[in-house]
Regions:
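Short boundary/linker motifs that mark transitions into or out of structured domains
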Residues: 1-20
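Long, charge-rich, low-complexity alpha-helical segments
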Residues: 22-180
């Protein structure tokens, strides 16, 4: 079993680790804080003796888990998350190439994109052009992403699981996560 942390770390005041997720702030004890922190930048295997703690984090929405392993596990963990830019990124990365293109989609699209949607854009070779970005580009972007076949709940996620662009996009997202 693998897991990936969700949410943002809130600055410590009294030594307690706090995590913000979906408008709520969670205070974590030492065990759960260590588990959350270890999977903050990359998926991690769930330690057998700590599975109970990971389950509690998942119930709170602070981690997502999967029984899969390898590239499919990374995809499933990321597809269960909405990808949002951090307000103030401390990391540095090149805006050139694939990483920069994906970053521009994440930063400037008129809606929050999922890993599946980003894979679809990569598969199509769609660049983040002004007519597809921002509030004004939201409708056109949605039409680019979805067809009558993929608009059904879970259809795009299932289709993108088998995309040749999947592993490359997942690698870019993990690099951006480290850079942020």
């Amino acid at each position: 079993m693998m897991y990936l942390s969700k949410g943002l770390s809130v600055p410590e005041k009294d030594g307690t680790v706090r995590v913000s997720h979906c408008g709520r702030i969670f205070a974590l004890g030492p065990e759960m804080a260590a588990l959350w922190e270890s999977a903050r930048l990359a998926p991690q295997p769930v330690p057998l003796q700590k599975a109970r703690f990971v389950e509690r984090l998942e119930q709170s929405g602070l981690v997502v888990t999967t029984q899969e392993e390898g590239g499919l596990a990374f995809y499933r963990l990321l597809s269960g998350s909405i990808i949002c830019p951090q307000a103030e990124s401390e990391g540095q990365f090149s805006e050139a190439g694939g990483d920069g293109r994906i970053w521009r989609w994440i930063q400037y699209a008129g809606l929050r994109l999922t890993a599946s949607e980003l894979i679809r854009l990569e598969e199509q070779g769609t660049d983040p052009t002004p007519n597809l970005l921002g509030e004004e580009g939201r409708q056109l972007l949605t039409e680019k992403l979805y067809s009558a076949r993929t608009i059904l709940e879970g259809a795009l996620e299932h289709e993108m699981e088998h995309s040749p662009a999947r592993d490359g996009l997942v690698a870019v997202l993990l690099r951006l996560l480290h850079a942020g």
